[in-house]
């Protein structure tokens, strides 16, 4: 955060927020969390072991906020510039004991009540006619691979959009999708919830790539500015 603030003249939209919260996401088996354990803690309110997705330390499924709110008629969205089976987005729809179980995690989309999921494609969706794509469409869940295609999907139909960033076109999926996300989820009568992740801040940190950390953080901060409007 401070690197991005320094690069941006000391200003961030995040710093304009009047209320912030603190969640301790350390796992049950270590002092330091990973994205799976932290994502599960954020999505469910319950700590677990590292590497687990939506399951407790014993491997039992834990209800996530997407499921809890959907049961009350609230519209829900999961948005990320990571792959759709990345640890953080999957914690909001999947229940698997190991974060590397990509195929099994992707298949949990078949039973997730999430109304809108936008994230980068992964191997499970390698072909437009993949088995998982066919199974989703059989459940009347639309699957598309470009944001503009969302306008063709009825507002009351669940949809998964498999699109990631395209830096060659200066296309950042979480920024470009924001207005569409709000429009679709606002169609419900009981409010909405959406989790939006800027995953590449972390990826830049792992690579010790300061430019990526700052660039991605400022991208996410622009999104925060839109949300505060």
What are these regions (language model features)?
Residues 129, 155, 174, 217-220, ...:
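Active-site-proximal structural scaffolding
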Residues 87-92, 165, 181, 189-228:
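Active-site His/acidic residue clusters
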Residues 144-146, 150-162, 177-199:
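Active-site regions of oxyanion-processing enzymes, predominantly non-cytosolic
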Residues 98, 170-178, 216-220:
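Phosphate/oxyanion-binding active-site loops and adjacent basic polyanion-contact surfaces
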Residues 45-49, 155-168, 202-207:
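Gly-rich Lys/Arg/Thr-decorated short loops/hinges at beta-loop-alpha junctions or inter-strand turns
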Residues 65-66, 105, 177-182, 224:
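Generic hydrophobic alpha-helical segments
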Residues 87-88, 126-128, 171, 204:
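Short helix/loop capping segments that flank catalytic or ligand/cofactor-binding pockets
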